[in-house]
């Protein structure tokens, strides 16, 4: 089924009709919603949380910085998106948004959506994701098309945003063949030895730059637990830990972020706007291998909610978390008549 995506003309027309003095910022009630909506409220925007369950809605209603909490059927999100347009709202997407509503609906939703919406289509395919990273010229793990090519330990990843669920390691091709039986869509990657590091970036059309904003480590069950070799390791993300990088690594990490932003514009055809993440392993020789990306805000940015990221102060001379950074960009774009540079 070919999905064309939201009509850019309709999105542009919606933005032109919006009252920029009364903009609302909306997001799905999960993932980084608290951070996004808190930041939006601090910058003077009305805020809307869209929940898929009544119990989630009840939880989000307790926070005074959220003006409205809606309950929606995510199986028909286009209808909710139309209501958001009527509410003069823009949508900030995150990983749970794409997982809950599905990438096809995320492409079709008529509400102005932060960032390069077409990138969602690429993120639905693990092979296209690796193609984009390679096009960016960042070092990546080797990808194997068949088990017969495998000559070292590998990790198998399922397609889609699943928080690491269903991923597994295989030590050799025999183990790999056995465990691939009956699996859906997946990619086989070289398993890189080192420590994980996830880099948060912000691409700013308003300021014409890519900012390196912070970093985190994922806390995964059960690979990070006390399993003592008794169970097969799994990689389900349950939380995130803060990470301050060696300063000598920052120029390389920033360069990779810039190269990735350029590759998206060239290959996907739309400019990155807002937060994104490159996910990597750092080896003991300090070399970096980037194995994954997210084209929007990642949950790891929650580690500095309310405190500000360790690097935001370098750009603005005051700490700012990613929710506040998004709101700052929206406010400045609205003031300068440049909302169309942020939303697709």
UniProtKB/Swiss-Prot annotation:
GO MF annotation list: ATP binding; ligase activity, forming carbon-nitrogen bonds; magnesium ion binding
Residues that hold Mg(2+) according to the record: 279, 292
Record carries keyword Nucleotide-binding: yes
InterPro entries documented for this protein: ATP-grasp, ATP_grasp_subdomain_1, IMP_biosynth_PurP, IMP_biosynth_PurP_C, IMP_biosynth_PurP_N, PreATP-grasp_dom_sf
Cited PROSITE patterns: ATP_GRASP
UniProt keyword annotations, A-Z: ATP-binding, Ligase, Magnesium, Manganese, Metal-binding, Nucleotide-binding, Purine biosynthesis
Entry cofactors: Mg(2+); Mn(2+)
Catalytic activity: 5-amino-1-(5-phospho-beta-D-ribosyl)imidazole-4-carboxamide + formate + ATP = 5-formamido-1-(5-phospho-D-ribosyl)imidazole-4-carboxamide + ADP + phosphate
Cofactor note (record): Binds 1 Mg(2+) or Mn(2+) ion per subunit.
GO biological process terms on file: 'de novo' IMP biosynthetic process
Pfam families the UniProt entry points to: DUF1246 (PF06849), DUF1297 (PF06973)
HAMAP family in alphabetical order: IMP_biosynth_PurP
Family named by the database record: Belongs to the phosphohexose mutase family.
Protein name (Swiss-Prot/TrEMBL): 5-formaminoimidazole-4-carboxamide-1-(beta)-D-ribofuranosyl 5'-monophosphate synthetase
Chain's gene name: purP
């Amino acid at each position: 089924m070919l999905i064309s995506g939201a009509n850019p003309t309709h999105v542009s027309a919606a933005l032109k009709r919006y009252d920029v003095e009364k903009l609302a910022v909306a997001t799905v009630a999960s993932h980084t919603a608290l951070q996004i909506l808190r930041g939006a409220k601090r910058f003077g925007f009305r805020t809307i949380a869209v929940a898929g369950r009544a119990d989630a809605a009840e939880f989000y209603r307790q926070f005074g910085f959220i003006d409205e909490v809606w309950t929606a059927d995510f199986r028909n999100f286009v209808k909710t998106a139309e209501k958001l347009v009527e509410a003069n709202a823009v949508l900030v997407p995150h990983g749970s948004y794409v997982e809950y509503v599905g990438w096809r609906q995320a492409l079709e939703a008529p509400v102005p959506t932060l960032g390069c919406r077409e990138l969602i289509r690429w993120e639905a395919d693990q092979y296209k994701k690796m193609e984009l990273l390679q096009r960016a010229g960042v070092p990546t793990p080797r990808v194997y098309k068949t088990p017969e090519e495998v000559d070292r330990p590998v990790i198998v990843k399922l397609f889609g945003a699943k928080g690491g669920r269903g991923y597994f390691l295989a030590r050799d091709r025999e183990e790999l063949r056995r465990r691939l039986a009956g699996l859906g869509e997946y990619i086989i990657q070289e398993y890189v030895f080192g420590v994980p590091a996830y880099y948060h970036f912000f691409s700013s059309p308003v300021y014409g730059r890519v900012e390196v904003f912070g970093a985190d480590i994922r806390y995964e069950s059960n690979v990070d637990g006390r399993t003592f070799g008794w169970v097969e390791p799994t990689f389900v993300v349950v939380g995130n830990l803060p990470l301050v990088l060696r300063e000598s690594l920052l120029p390389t990490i920033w360069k990779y972020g810039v190269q990735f932003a350029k590759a998206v514009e060239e290959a996907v055809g739309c400019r990155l706007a807002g937060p994104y993440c490159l996910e990597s392993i750092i080896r003991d020789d300090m070399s970096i291998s980037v194995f994954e990306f997210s084209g929007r805000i990642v949950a790891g940015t929650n580690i500095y909610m309310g405190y500000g990221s360790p690097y935001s102060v370098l750009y603005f001379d005051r700490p700012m978390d990613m929710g506040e950074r998004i709101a700052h960009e929206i406010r400045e774009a609205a003031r300068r008549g440049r909302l169309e540079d942020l939303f697709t």
